[in-house]
Design a protein with these regions (language model features):
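Glycine-rich phosphate-binding loop and adjoining beta1-alpha1-beta2 segment
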Residues: 56-79
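Conserved Rossmann-fold NAD(P)-dependent oxidoreductase catalytic core, especially the SDR/UDP-sugar
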Residues: 130-147
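NAD(P)H-binding glycine-rich loop region in Rossmannoid oxidoreductase-like domains
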Residues: 79-130, 138
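N-terminal Rossmann NAD(P)H-binding glycine-rich loop of SDR-like oxidoreductase domains
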Residues: 2-22
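Structural motif
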Residues: 1, 105-106, 146
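A structural signal for isolated positions on well-ordered beta-strands in alpha/beta enzyme cores
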Residues: 54-56, 85
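Short, basic, low-complexity termini and linkers enriched in Ser/Thr/Gly/Pro
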Residues: 16, 20-49
Length: 147
């Protein structure tokens, strides 16, 4: 399973579409039909047949998904692909992150607050520092292979 934060932003939406597209391309390029005369390779061929990996996207309940949908459309997906699951929460909520990552082998952390307004310092520190710390700690706790 793949877990992505920041899917509604510029980088996260393109990363999501790229990973969905990579899976589609990989799935379509496989020829996994076992050849009857090659019985010894049937087991290895069958292991290539896998369902598309689930991609879990962390987003807030009030998130605007319009950018993500537009980017997916540019990659040829008119609807949210069926292997995408939404996890509603925030990177500052460690428990949600740990639960979402428990089966993840890849995690991509793209969530951030971007602002040049000095009055946003508290929010910047909370999301960008505390949120990233939570992401790293949850990934370590869950044994994520790729972060």
């Amino acid at each position: 399973m793949i877990f992505i934060t920041g899917c509604t932003g510029l980088v996260g939406s393109h990363l999501t579409a790229s990973l969905v597209n990579r899976q589609q391309t990989t799935d379509n390029s496989r020829d996994v039909t076992p050849v009857a005369s090659d019985v010894t390779n049937i087991a290895s061929d069958v292991t290539l047949v896998e369902s598309k990996r689930i991609i879990k996207l962390l987003c807030r309940k009030n998130s605007d998904l319009s950018l993500l949908k537009r980017v997916l459309a540019r990659y040829g997906y008119n609807d949210i692909p069926e292997n995408i699951e939404f996890v509603y929460g925030d990177v500052t909520d460690y428990d949600i992150l740990e639960e979402a990552m428990k089966d993840a082998d890849e995690v991509y952390h793209c969530a951030a607050v971007v602002s040049f307004d000095p009055s946003d310092k508290k929010s910047l520190m909370r999301v960008n520092v505390e949120g990233t710390r939570n992401m790293v700690n949850a990934a370590l706790q869950c044994g994520v292979k790729k972060f």
